[in-house]
């Protein structure tokens, strides 16, 4: 199975992302429900501009983060580590992403928080269900996939 396809299928079944930003040597992490766009290889999240992580992100910033399940045994561990860039969406781009996000999370219709995109540039997917320590790596710029 193609690496990005396997990663995308797993991410579509999850819903919480943790991402971290840094500014002037200070680190901060946050969690949010996400919508994953497999075509753009990006997460869409809602978060208020007044939050510490949004303030540190500014209009765009480098990010790293994870998505993981909560298995009860090591043999079932699956999770993603990633790096990329976060940016606040504006205008039509924001409107389209919000509509898709609201379809996945209808309760979000009540929120006015801005929409942000986390564009993934590198993904490492650990899937112990395929064998202990099995890792798949995807890199945006090189088109590289490693199993």
UniProtKB/Swiss-Prot annotation:
InterPro entries: Split_barrel_FMN-bd, UPF0306. It comes from the Bacteria. This is UPF0306 protein YhbP. Belongs to the UPF0306 family. Signal peptide: none annotated. It comes from Escherichia coli O8 (strain IAI1). The gene is yhbP.
């Amino acid at each position: 199975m193609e690496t990005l396809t396997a990663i995308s299928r797993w991410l579509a079944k999850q819903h919480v992302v943790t991402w971290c930003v840094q500014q002037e040597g200070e680190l901060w992490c946050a969690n949010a429900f996400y919508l994953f766009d497999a075509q753009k290889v990006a997460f869409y999240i809602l978060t208020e501009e007044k939050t510490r992580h949004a303030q540190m992100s500014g209009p765009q910033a480098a990010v790293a983060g994870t998505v993981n399940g909560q298995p009860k045994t090591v043999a079932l561990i699956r999770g993603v580590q990633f790096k990329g860039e976060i940016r606040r969406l504006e205008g039509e781009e924001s409107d389209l992403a919000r509509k898709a996000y609201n379809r996945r999370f209808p309760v979000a219709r009540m929120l006015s928080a801005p929409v942000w995109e986390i564009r993934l540039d590198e993904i490492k997917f650990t899937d112990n269900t395929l064998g202990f320590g099995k890792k798949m790596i995807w890199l945006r710029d090189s088109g590289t996939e490693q199993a």
